[in-house]
Amino acid sequence: DKNEIGKESSWAGAGILFPLMPWIYPSEVYDLCLNSAEFYKEFSKKLFKVTGIDPEFDRTGMMIIPPYDLNKINKWASKNQYKIEDVEFHKSTALLLPCVAQIRSPRLMKAIKKYLIHQGIKIIENTELCPIKNSAKLINEWLTKDNNLIKADYFIVTSGAWVSMIKPKYTNKIYPV
C-alpha cells in the first residue's frame, strides 16, 4: 500500500453495500451489489471468527428522501422484486429500502489485514510503486519509488480509481459505480 493499509479512502468509505440509486444504473451494478452483500455477510462472520475483529455487517436499510422519481423507482423495484416501504420523514413521505446492508469500513480493513497476515500473506505498507512499464499480463517483480525491487509470484492491485498512477494506459478508463 502507498500508505498504511485501510487508512485512506477505505477508511472514509460509508460502507453502504448497495448503489445509492440503483434505478439509474445498469442492472449489472445492482446484481453485483446484491451478491456482494451476501458475500460480506458470510465473510464478516469468517473474519470475526479468525481475527476477533467484528466488521459489524448490519442490514440497517436505506432511506430515500424527496425529491425522487417514484415511477422510475417502482418500475425498478417491480422488475427486481425489491421491497420498498413508505415512511414518514419530516412531515413528508420517504422511501425505505429495508434490505440494504452496511459494514464498518475501518473495522473491515483492520480485520482483513489481520486475516491476511494470519494466512501468511506479506503486506507491504508505506511503499509507492513505479508505473508498470511492460505490457505483460503477469509480472513477478515491481520497482518502488525508492528504487527497491519487490519480487513475488503474484501482485494484487487494489488501487481502484488510482490504478492509472501505476498503469497509465488505464487513465480515463476506470469509473466509480
PLM region spans:
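Glycine-rich nucleotide phosphate-binding loop and flanking beta-alpha elements
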Residues: 71, 130-131, 162-164
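Short beta-strand to alpha-helix junction loop
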Residues: 31-34, 67-70, 95-114
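Dinucleotide-binding Rossmann-like beta1-alpha1 core, especially the glycine-rich loop
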Residues: 15-93
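Glycine-rich FAD pyrophosphate-binding loop
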Residues: 1-13
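A conserved short coil-to-beta-strand element within the FAD-binding core of flavoproteins
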Residues: 122-141
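Central helical "cap/lid" subdomain
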Residues: 6, 148-177
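Short glycine-/acidic-enriched loop or helix-start segments at secondary-structure transitions
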Residues: 9, 29, 134, 166-168
